[in-house]
């Protein structure tokens, strides 16, 4: 499964004295999940970032549970499908629905 994961800063920031340890943990987390991430990006000029995972549901859940900044973040997970395949399927489904409604 491919999924876009968007991480934004949450309502509570980590205590400043915890940042060095959190950043070390973040680097280790990235190394652990690197092979299953197609993209790994930070937002320019603000907190947060995004990544594209290619992993099964259990693996994605595990990665998010292990994410060091999760207590201080809002995380959105969006499963994705191939765009060309989705467009083709949506076009076909729309044609079928319109035909059933007498409009196609």
For each feature predicted by the language model, list its residue ranges:
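Conserved, structured core segments of small domains
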Residues: 1-104
